[in-house]
Curated annotation (Swiss-Prot):
Family stated for the protein in its record: Belongs to the TVP23 family.
Full protein name: Golgi apparatus membrane protein TVP23
Glycosylation sites: 63, 161, 180
Pfam families linked to this entry: DUF846
A single Gene Ontology CC term: Golgi membrane
Length: 196
């Protein structure tokens, strides 16, 4: 019982205790629903509930709690005109800003790194138990929490004064435009018409 009281006191020492509570609840809720999955009448209802909770946590962490607790914000730019895939906003850009509370930072980063690790362990257990449909749910959860963690990690290590530090170590491939596919189709139809 002392652990619960100490944890409660730690959250109260946060600069945003309500926001911190929602952040931690957003990480714990999908895990709790997964563990209590036997209470659901069907796996489909459980799957949809967990994916919706994960999506809400992804949005809340990325746009609200990350911005307020550690003063970081990131987004992925999928436009073909941009050479940089990630765009970052950080407290490092602004000289006179409020300091980051160490309790906020510690709880934020622990929850960000611990959540994908827990989902990964649950994924290994699902594979060992040969529950492949359950593994799909866990893979979605691991990808969503891991992608958010990766974005915040890159944002935290980003240096606004160094333009080369914006390149993440993992680059998603760019999808070519449809004009290349139409050129290929015209080229192929040229040879088909010549053969006839």
């Amino acid at each position: 019982m002392d652990h619960v009281r100490n944890f409660y006191d730690t959250i109260l020492r946060s600069s945003h205790p309500l926001l911190m509570a929602f952040h931690l609840a957003g990480k714990a809720a999908p895990l709790a629903f997964y563990i209590a999955g036997f209470l659901f009448p069907s796996f489909t209802a459980l799957f949809i509930t967990i994916v919706l909770l994960l999506a809400a946590d992804f949005y809340f962490t990325k746009n609200i709690s990350g911005r307020r607790l550690v003063q970081l914000r990131w987004w992925y730019d999928s436009s073909a005109t941009s050479t940089e895939t990630f765009t970052f906003e950080s407290h490092k850009q602004y000289t006179a800003g409020p300091p980051i509370n160490p309790i906020d930072s510690k709880l934020f980063w622990w929850s960000m790194y611990l959540t994908p690790a827990i989902w990964f362990v649950l994924g290994i257990l699902a594979i060992l138990r040969l529950k492949l449909i359950t593994f799909i749910l866990i893979a979605v959860a691991t990808c969503m929490t891991g992608w958010n963690t990766y974005g915040f990690r890159c944002c935290d290590r980003w240096n606004p004064n160094n333009s080369q530090s914006t390149e993440p170590f993992f680059q998603l491939p760019s999808i070519p435009g449809l004009d290349n596919i139409t050129r290929l189709a015209r080229f192929q139809s040229f040879f088909q018409s010549a053969a006839n």
